Amino acid sequence: MGISRDNWHKRRKTGGKRKPYHKKRKYEPGRPAANTKIGPRRIHTVRVRGGNKKYRALRLDAGNFSWGSECCTRKTRIIDVVYNASNNELVRTKTLVKNCILLVDSTPFRQWFEAHYALPLGRKKGAKLTPEEEEILNKKRSKKTQKKYEERKKTAKISPLLEEQFQQGKLLACIASRPGQCGRADGYVLEGKELEFYLRKIKAKKGK
């Protein structure tokens, strides 16, 4: 007897029992949770109703995360799970689920920002640049190209909270996809009011 997602085994609202008028059906089984962890990619396919497929991610180590204010999406490494509004147990076991808050590697976003604006981001004062980074930031450009970069620099503003995270090399992000259903951990980088809210929550949790 498998587990099934049905409601005819429950009593009525009045308290009376229901007579089962059919057996358990193949279209109403309950399956074990994926409990996606951080690790080398491992995905199982599950055949579901209609011959369709679901992708159960058992382990994931990267995902596509978008930086909304800069309209930039990059594949980046998942480092750690830091907060989950629904269950602290899922933070302790580092389980990836939709809407959990995690730390992702900031390097792809920093590289994009520096190439796009020709400005350093999240660098410690007086830090040495590698020859490749030096070339990107201090490249000799034609007048027309230089003018384009000067125009871009006018809008290259980043909030102090994000700047601080770039210095640490880790960004707070939220998962928007469902890893146990589609086999991917994609999401967005936290910014603005949402970032402030979750920083407060994480700080309060650490203080306990």
Swiss-Prot record:
Q: What is its main location?
A: cytoplasm
Q: How does the protein's chain sit in the membrane according to the entry?
A: Lipid-anchor
List the keywords (alphabetical): Cytoplasm, Lipoprotein, Membrane, Nucleus, Ribonucleoprotein, Ribosomal protein
Query: Is RNA-binding a UniProt keyword of this protein?
Result: no
Tell whether Lipoprotein is among the UniProt keywords: yes
Cell location? Cytoplasm; Membrane; Nucleus, Nucleolus
Instruction: Please provide one cellular component term from the Gene Ontology annotations of this protein.
Output: small-subunit processome
Q: Some GO term, biological process aspect, for this entry: which one? A: translation
What InterPro entries does UniProt report for this protein, alphabetically? Ribosomal_eS8, Ribosomal_eS8_CS, Ribosomal_protein_eS8_euk, Ribosomal_Se8/biogenesis_NSA2
- In this chain, composition skew of type Basic residues spans 8-26
Matching PANTHER family, A to Z? 40S RIBOSOMAL PROTEIN S8 (PTHR10394)
Query: What quaternary structure, including any partners, is listed in this protein's UniProt entry?
Result: Component of the small ribosomal subunit. Identified in a IGF2BP1-dependent mRNP granule complex containing untranslated mRNAs. Part of the small subunit (SSU) processome, composed of more than 70 proteins and the RNA chaperone small nucleolar RNA (snoRNA) U3.
Role, per record: Component of the small ribosomal subunit. The ribosome is a large ribonucleoprotein complex responsible for the synthesis of proteins in the cell. Part of the small subunit (SSU) processome, first precursor of the small eukaryotic ribosomal subunit. During the assembly of the SSU processome in the nucleolus, many ribosome biogenesis factors, an RNA chaperone and ribosomal proteins associate with the nascent pre-rRNA and work in concert to generate RNA folding, modifications, rearrangements and cleavage as well as targeted degradation of pre-ribosomal RNA by the RNA exosome.
What this protein is called in its record is: Small ribosomal subunit protein eS8
Q: From which organism does this entry originate?
A: Xenopus laevis
Report which gene this protein is encoded by: rps8
